[in-house]
Amino acid sequence: MRILGLDLGKKTIGVAISDPLGFTAQGITTIRRANKEKDMEELRKICDEYKVETIVIGLPKNMNGTIGPSGEIAMEMGKLVEEALNIKVEFWDERLTTVAAHKAMLEADLSRSKRKKIVDKVASTYILQGYLDRISK
C-alpha cells in the first residue's frame, strides 16, 4: 500500500511517497504546474508507477484552525484529483510544514537557490510523514 503526499503551491506541487509498508515518507519530485489537465497527467503517471492507493493533500489552515481561501482551493483540488484519478484523497493539516522544511534545510546548510528548488518536496514529506505517524497509532 503506497500513499502519496502533496504540498500544493501556486507554481509547483511537492510530491512525496510512502514506503510499501506505510512507515516512512520520502520526497520524490516537484511538479511544475501548467494547467489542470497536465497536472493530473503528471500525478496519474506517478500514481501508476508507485501503485498509489491514497493521496494525502496538505490542507492550509489559519493558525486558529479555520480554513481560509488557500484551504478551499486545496479542497477543490482534492475533489478534482479524486474524480480524475479515482483514488481516495485525505487531507492533512499542513500548518507550519513549510516553516519546518525551511528550518531543516537551513540547519543542513543548503544554499538559498537549492532550498527554493526543493522546499515543496520537503514540505510534502512532512505532510505525508505526519499522516503516516497518525494512522500507525
UniProtKB/Swiss-Prot annotation:
GO molecular function, one term: nuclease activity
GO cellular component: cytosol
EC code: 3.1.-.-
Protein name: Putative pre-16S rRNA nuclease
Primary role: Could be a nuclease involved in processing of the 5'-end of pre-16S rRNA.
InterPro entries per the UniProt record, alphabetical: RNaseH-like_sf (IPR012337), YqgF (IPR005227), YqgF/RNaseH-like_dom (IPR006641), YqgF/RNaseH-like_dom_sf (IPR037027)
Localization annotation: Cytoplasm
Keywords, comma-separated and alphabetical: Cytoplasm, Hydrolase, Nuclease, Ribosome biogenesis
Family of this protein: Belongs to the YqgF nuclease family.
Cysteine disulfide partners in this protein: none
Coiled-coil spans in chain: none
SMART domains: YqgFc (SM00732)
Source organism: Clostridium botulinum (strain Alaska E43 / Type E3)
One Gene Ontology biological process: rRNA 5'-end processing
